[in-house]
Amino acid sequence: MSLLPNKEQKEAIEHIDGPLLALAGAGSGKTRVITERIAYLIKKGIYPNNILAVTFTNKAAAEMRERIVLLLKEKPKGLIISTFHSFCLRVLKAEINKLGYKNNFTIYSSSDSRTLIRSILREIKVNTLNYDENLFAWYIDKYKNNLIKPNEVEPHDDLEKIAKRVYEVYQNYLKGYNSLDFNDLINLTIDLFIEFPEVLDKYQERFKYIMIDEYQDTNLAQYKLTSLLASKYKNIAVVGDDDQSIYGFRGAEISNILSFEKQYKDAKIITLTKNYRSTKAILEAAHAVISNNTQRKDKKVTAEGEDGIPPDIISCEDEREEAKFIAESIINYSITKKLNYENFAVLFRMNAQSRLFEEAFRLRGLPYTVVGAFQFYERKEIKDILAYLNLFVNPEDEVSLLRVINIPKRGIGATAINNLNEISVKNGESLYQTLLNYNNIDDIPPRAKTGIKDFLEIIERYNNIFTVDKNALEKPKLYENINKFLDEIAYHNEVLNSSDTREQGNKKIENIESLMNGIAEYERGNKNATLKNYLDRILLMSMEENNEEEKKKGIMLMSIHSAKGLEFPYVYIAGMEDGILPHHKSVSEKEIEEERRLCYVAMTRAKKHLTLTHCLSRTRMGKKVECLPSIFLEEMQKGLPENMAMNEEEFIDNLRLSLKAERN
């Protein structure tokens, strides 16, 4: 990309007052526009303290902060660049007491929420053979994304009646435990702004200039939040691409970006169409597909780089042949063009497609990484420690309490826990409150009572250690005290003894050491480090960053959703078949259009060359089933100029000949 912004970028960067929509096509430099606009505003005399920039991931926020420091040669004081959830957490920490919560609230991860839902299903006697917690977690997520409170749910069938009841009980328990789930961070901030206009006014005065990245991915709740904040001064600048709106299943509303100028009548619309990533051939093919959508802004992204060669469309006999072909094609490119394997990515619509590619790559000794594999903060040993740390901040957190009350083993068995649960429900109190009265409960055996006594003593002692006195000159040392706690309960021994193999146990110990190293780094980098702030930080990171656990090596294997925002010189899109892409569950025109956007996103990840494969048959339910090529392949071929036609057989023959020559 040029050192200087192009005409359209410059126009967006230098827009100061009033609403702005920057329609940023794939690879058109939208991050540059946001960061340079922030720097421009500050240079023009806007106080950094009055600027709020919101994005979807901590990684994107960190990159923006780094770029702005480079542009301004200093770190602007008071500037807020954060995710939606981090921003709302900041607000709630200061204001949540107005909504009847205490400031030491716990944030539930999605697995914590599912654990709570599972216990609710048992409590209200729902048959979990027919309905599991994942189904009701989906309902609750849908309701919250659409700002529907439990009393506002209008059930249309018996299942939705159960979902409404589960939602009601779930919210009651969360409030009783002084806890929020991830959606509550945004929804309660909206409630706060609506119920307390003076609070909204305070934040409107603070953030007079608002910028939102990836606006096409916002849901109703995020739209409502930003609309409230921007309603006073209307200095809202949003950047996004309607053609890359692929999160409808998470509640994203493409209408938010398509109707921006209807909401803000005097909005300035700037279209960024110069692509600095892909070749002309790749962009022509991608446009031939996406132009079939009706719900989109009319635009065409053009290449600033080389013309390139047309994408390859390859027919394979079946899915094993497809995996074999892609593996050997990568080997061919890596040998003939002297490329390392980090230049290649294989994208697919469904995670289940990765298995055969893994087998094919292992068979040929190819290094690869499956993006989106088991995440660090979801590992058992890490979740156990975090559950304890949550209890040290908020002893009422029932999900954390149930997770570790008998870790390490204290003689508190399932029967004792069930009895305690029944008593807490009967008395209308938290499980922690019931535990405090354990000596007065006859149904608890002596060994369990001893275990409860030891457990409570640990929780109370460390709760006292980590309860921060605002006037204290010195904050409690996190690393030192957490290390001391782990030694006290002999957790390392517990992990080793409960592991199937010594090797597995040692890996878990390494994970614990990694967690402790992270705590030490956090403490070194934050003068006012507290356990509560640390827990909030890593919860947000683990929820928002689903692919960024470690440096990826080798060929990237990932879903198209995981690939958004990334780029690779050589990209393979596997499974270009009817029923896969587009997905067999996408039947309405709206759903097909989202699948088409998904295809467009996948195609525009490629910088130099793109290969699309489809199978003539696949094994389903143990039987070979005939497959039809994706309609998107047909659209692509129809929309391409004649000089971009691909001779498929010639390509495969050339590939096989070159492989044979190299191996001989």
Predicted features and spans:
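A basic/glycine-biased coupling hinge at the interface between accessory DNA-binding modules
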Residues: 17-20, 28, 39-209, 234, ...
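Helicase P-loop NTPase motor core
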Residues: 22, 26-34, 96, 102, ...
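Acidic, low-complexity intrinsically disordered tails
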Residues: 1, 641-664
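Conserved helicase C-terminal RecA-like lobe
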Residues: 156, 354-366, 379, 386-639
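Short glycine-/polar-rich loops that comprise or flank the Walker A/P-loop
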Residues: 18, 46-50, 75-78, 232-235, ...
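N-terminal pre-P-loop "Q-motif" helix
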Residues: 2-16, 221
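Conserved helicase motor core of SF1/SF2 NTP-dependent helicases
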Residues: 28, 216-292, 299-304, 440
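Hydrophobic residues in beta-strands of the RecA-like P-loop NTPase core, especially within AAA+ ATPase
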Residues: 48, 211-218, 239-240, 573
